[in-house]
């Protein structure tokens, strides 16, 4: 740790740099910036680092002269000269910019004061902060903050390339206590738009090169840069606008980015940099170590937010903000600087044991700054007085500069770089490339390298050993770190000094985690011990035990003192174990990693707070900053932050080291066996190692073929319905391994080459190690895609690639599937017991036609459910007769699509087929018995009386005996009653009643509102397209319900009732369905809100009165809203978990029953017809089967065009069908 930090009273990061300006290294170089590292060539002598070479252009940035009294504008002119040197550079191949620690601090002071001056002009719109000149009159002991706006909500966005300017702004923001959010042009434009809308920064500071490129088409005369026209030579054009294309600059739609920027305050950084100093500030303030307190935006914020990063994580798709505070970042850096730890870097002038040369500590800052590793990589050096090399510029992102290992060699050789930070995938690529070069070149050119820090993913022990086989220098260290963005980067770490350390800290975990056969396992490498002020637990899998305590653990009041439990590290306060929601596993057991303590960001999406005990814990860590403890006591003295990063791991009982096994979202459980996707990749490595040991002799043909595989990535692939369906292994052959692996679309190898492994070859090999149900699908691609910025394997990209090539796309699920295979011959399905071969009957026989029709119908079901093989074709014989349509992902929408496709094949089918049963065999049998003709026209409903069967269990009717009972629906299929082991005794039924008939009803008004609002918010696409919120929907429903007071219509409710004496429960009931109708002549208009008024205009357009003057509204009933809850009412019953999917079928049956009962009651009350507006495919299909006729269909897109309103593409296919059903009213 830097010696200067010992005198700190608070861990404010910028004070570390300010202390360095008072030390002997203040005039030493802090930054070397190489704008064009791709073409950088190292030509100078290895032993003369400080010698200048003619091929190297070194530009030392000019600082403002301290003699500022000669010319009041001299300060401004010098800053202008500095800016011109950087902006107008032609970026020769070996151009280098440098800046010392003192000049870096002065430049940050200047930018901080200019930025504060600019924000002062608009401060009234940000906060009601008092005048800066009055700030000195206030006591510094004020405890309450002056600002009415929270510091954590005041964020500035920075859109700048790598370089000195970017670092200056970062430090300036720290001095102002102003949180900054980095924007990277390697992030897609759409995601940047999401981020900006979510965080709403007060200012977007953009680099001039970026600005010129984005707005070059809008103003060639550079009108928007008029503020700089007098100070910047307009004849010089930026390198970016000359060398970059739109696709090179940013991913996605550049116009979308322009539209987003128009919503925010956007300023060019050079404008802020070259502003004249405010009259409230003195130029002498620039050259002091710190800026005056009156300049600081939030001077009394003791633990300000420094950095805001966005991460998508592994459990959701949207961007999630993570706000990192000073104490978190300082604690992480202090951990690395600790001189008593192996984490500390070598001394600044550390003479190596086997060399006569001294090695300086020089870092490489190459990580994309949208990742937390970029912060620790850069400021762990700068704030400790260690210089850094920053590659990349406007035309070359920093991470792109080191993709080729030769560029890394050139930079390391020239600058004598001593340590670098990387990710495992990137390091693996480097090792492959370095092995192709002569060892002498690698040894001599990388002789200064001493430390390689690896983080961000799991490091395989084999790769760690290969690293030390290549770098045999005894001073070389490999540091394996573990952490996430939510914990400020890293929380554990371990230093390896050779292969012996790697083998010592490698453990073998059984494949599948629970398999009894331990012969085949995967090796995992330790990630070491935990950072100070933080603890790590290994807790129970909630899928098995619901994370509850067991009785044997409840008897132990202090689990921390139990050495057998999976707990390492320490926190300031003990958790209240009675409130702790997890069961802690014994050491050596694999479970979920759980992180507690001050390193956890309070903005983490999966962070929760638990109660702590008041007494302090006797922590092992004693080297704590006092302000950390005070901050913890002031902010959350009674709570501890707990974070679940989504990783699986265990703690070694002997060493107390943490081992990470994989991700929870890559874990599947089949037949009671948990299996991790990475187990397939590790099994590949172990098998190839065994084959190599026996020199490929006595190997089978399949083993010889599989040995050609170079790399693999195995993932759990989900269906479009969200179920983990299978394991998919993407593999690359040896012939493809040298191809570029950056994130470009992988291509499958369709070449008809001989002796390439096939699916059967893989299965033949893996069947000896894996059960059949765990065998993955193998797909050969030409390379493994990597993420552009982090260098990690782009797993989400592979998943989307699989969906597009081998699976039914999500966007395609709402389209009508065209049966192009209608006339294809039907193949014999040997695995299906119900299929019959063509040889069994004559081709003209009725049985043959029925069998062929059955298999065509099966193919339709497979298409709709997305059941496809690895080649994208429908799997023969699937779905099987004993499978369930709803368990395979079927729902009400898919039943409509299936019905439509079956009708195109000539089947006389309606939704009743899917409401009676979900079994595939039963559905196919019902279809076999249908005739190939059109649906018969249904007769109008009459008011004939209908009877209700006697109900066996009178207890169920305790609360419904006064209701006007219309119908009842049992919640179980007939086959369930035949099996006492499947269906427990009890009563599970739905009763439909008329809510507004004047009789007593147990259904309350608020229940109707809640069911309708929740259903429309969740499933109604029209509400989504028009952006209706809960307030809009609630007001619309209340309007319809209020109309019943003067002009009553018909409101039907469906309630679920349940009683089981074996569960000792009372009668339970819940509202599960509602339909509201009103007399058509008295339907109120919706004009309460602008969005409801838009809905009203749309429906008016659908029922244009000029076109339907012959339809009289006098005796018509109009259906307004209908909804069925999507959540099963019996989902909490411990006996009925197997019936959850059955609710999809029941809900469709209930919807049909509600619509049918409405028609019956309407006919009985004398209505001549019922009209309805259907914007949902399911309700439209139900109404069609009940005899409704379509009067008019209106597309939402055409309506929105008339209104001059934008409509998102995913909603363009929404239509409204205006339908009518004629009735025969009773006399």
UniProtKB/Swiss-Prot annotation:
This is Beta-alanyl-bioamine nonribosomal peptide synthetase. GO terms for biological process: amino acid adenylylation by nonribosomal peptide synthase; female genitalia development. Belongs to the NRP synthetase family. Its EC number is 6.3.2.-. It catalyses: tryptamine + beta-alanine + ATP = beta-alanyl-tryptamine + AMP + diphosphate + H(+); beta-alanine + ATP + H(+) = beta-alanyl-5'-AMP + diphosphate; beta-alanyl-5'-AMP + holo-[peptidyl-carrier protein] = beta-alanyl-[peptidyl-carrier protein] + AMP + H(+); beta-alanyl-[peptidyl-carrier protein] + tryptamine = beta-alanyl-tryptamine + holo-[peptidyl-carrier protein] + H(+). The nonribosomal peptide synthase is composed of three domains. The adenylation (A) domain is responsible for the adenylation and activation of beta-alanine using ATP. The thiolation (T) or peptidyl carrier protein domain (PCP) contains the prosthetic group 4'-phosphopantetheine; activated beta-alanyl-AMP is transferred to the prosthetic group via thiolation. The condensation (C) domain performs the selection of the amine substrate, tryptamine, and the condensation of this amine with beta-alanine via an amide bond. Residues 1-850 are annotated as: Adenylation.
